[in-house]
């Protein structure tokens, strides 16, 4: 019997924001593989299945296990938080298969199940911060040299992109966001809006709307489940929301026909 490997994005962590297709393939699977925290997010969907839980740094072991199980004829779901194609497990799966000489037309079937990424879920909680061009940068230098990350931050800052920052800090990484702030201040004012979202759509969710001048005061809100969104030169704060205007105001009258009651 031919197996199949699904790489499944489960979104920010709450079932309400998991796609129907993601739930469907997890329920259809014989085997579930993933980082233990992410597997626990779908615990109620995996009763009676073979489950392989791994620590955070065991990405390669996760990839090898799910490929082995699928090659042995199992239907496997590799669980990834957010979207597996954005800093997720999709890349490692394809790299591992490519190294083994895999042929996507005749070999093991692989399907990526997209999910709601942190940039989507976090943006939805703070207004409309991503209405114009934006860049996404991860501060994690475990696999990418810090010098390259700095170059990318510099380019995004100089280009006046709204910047979404993944993995802004950890117990071992405390200087990265501080260095990033210094780079941003070369091109942006101190009152540039900044949002810090931790645990989006989870019970522990917290949201801070601040600016480049004061963002370091909220270091306790930073971590691996935090996302930072830095506005560009046109972004502004409005009643604790970040608005990144698309440009309609310069061409149209945006006043409502009737006064909105507060």
Residue ranges: model-predicted function:
Residues 1-110, 218, 257-261:
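Class I S-adenosyl-L-methionine
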Residues 5, 158-262:
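A contiguous loop/helix-start segment that scaffolds small-molecule binding in enzyme catalytic cores
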Residues 12-17, 143-146, 209:
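Short gly/ser/thr-rich secondary-structure transition/capping motifs
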